[in-house]
Amino acid sequence: MDIGIIFPQTEIETGKDAIIKFAKTAENLGFSHIFMADHVLGANPAVHEHVRDHYYTHDSIINEVFVTLGFISAITETIGLMTGILILPQRSAALVAK
């Protein structure tokens, strides 16, 4: 059975050292993959009432999916990488297809 781990987008400290520690620890613990959710922009709770209870907003630091997974792929050897969602309208379709 494959068991993965979710990349802690809003909980992880900023900077490469925190990402390195998380990825290498996940790999060393035997997780099969790291799952990363895509959120290019968080919503502003003052304008969008439905997001008031969410854990991320427009002020949250959110790591870009392709850059972060590319970085993790360079520092790990066996762990798989995946996005759980990719918000295409917020990205260039040609770059996503590439």
What is each PLM-predicted segment?
Residues M1-I75:
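N-terminal beta1-alpha1-beta2 module of alpha/beta enzyme domains
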Residues Y55-H58, M82, P89:
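Residues at structural and domain junctions
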Residues H39, I85-I87:
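Residue-level "edge-of-site" marker
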Residues T76-G84:
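Conserved catalytic cysteine-centered active-site region
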Residues L88, L95:
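Glycine/small-residue-rich loop that forms an oxyanion/phosphate-binding "nest" at active or ligand-binding sites
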Residues V67, A97-K98:
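Active-site-adjacent beta->alpha loops and helix N-cap segments on the catalytic face
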